[in-house]
């Protein structure tokens, strides 16, 4: 395993595209100087995230940007190659977020230029959907098994998940799966 001791101060998830290259570079430079991590957001790892050498938390959402097949499903080989970069210190699997629990998203094709297409592994000029749920797994046990697979493919880096839940039952089901599968 490759444990990572995170600072109490880190940079929250914000994708390149939502923020400019200058903003991403400045945030990553700050992470390098401050010795804390910079979360990429679900848009993938851009050259601007790695330019200054700050530690990265690579966030992977339902669109699997930067590690997807043409049909939008998870691509293990692309994930393995990106996750094993030295600068990527940990991985965050985004299940849902408070602003839009249970909803996907859509990036209009007009915003998918050559650079965005390359970073996200999508087609230039085409609308890109982020489904409301992951296609790589189903249910709590599927989630925990997928987390373990991501950990193994990354060479033992820490893998966590981000979620917004509507009931305690959902959270307890994930905890039960972790205990049953002995994946922590």
Model-derived regions: residue spans:
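Active-site entrance/lid segments in N-terminal catalytic domains of soluble metabolic enzymes
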Residues: 1-184
């Amino acid at each position: 395993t490759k444990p990572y001791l995170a600072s109490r101060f880190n940079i929250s998830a914000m994708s390149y595209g939502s923020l400019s290259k200058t903003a991403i570079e400045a945030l990553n430079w700050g992470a390098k100087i401050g010795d804390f991590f910079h979360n990429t957001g679900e848009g993938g790892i851009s050259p601007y995230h790695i330019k200054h050498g700050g530690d990265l938390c690579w966030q992977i959402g339902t669109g699997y940007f930067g590690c997807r097949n043409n049909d939008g499903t998870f691509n293990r080989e692309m994930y393995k190659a990106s996750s094993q970069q030295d600068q990527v210190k940990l991985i965050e699997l985004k299940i849902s977020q408070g602003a839009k629990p249970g909803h996907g998203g859509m990036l209009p094709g007009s915003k998918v230029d050559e650079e965005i297409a390359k970073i996200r592994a999508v087609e230039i000029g085409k609308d890109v959907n982020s489904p409301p749920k992951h296609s790589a797994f189903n249910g709590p046990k599927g989630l925990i098994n997928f987390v373990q697979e991501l950990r193994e493919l990354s060479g033992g880096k820490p893998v966590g998940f981000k979620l917004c839940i509507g009931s305690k039952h959902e959270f307890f089901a994930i905890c039960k799966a972790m205990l049953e599968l002995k994946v922590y």
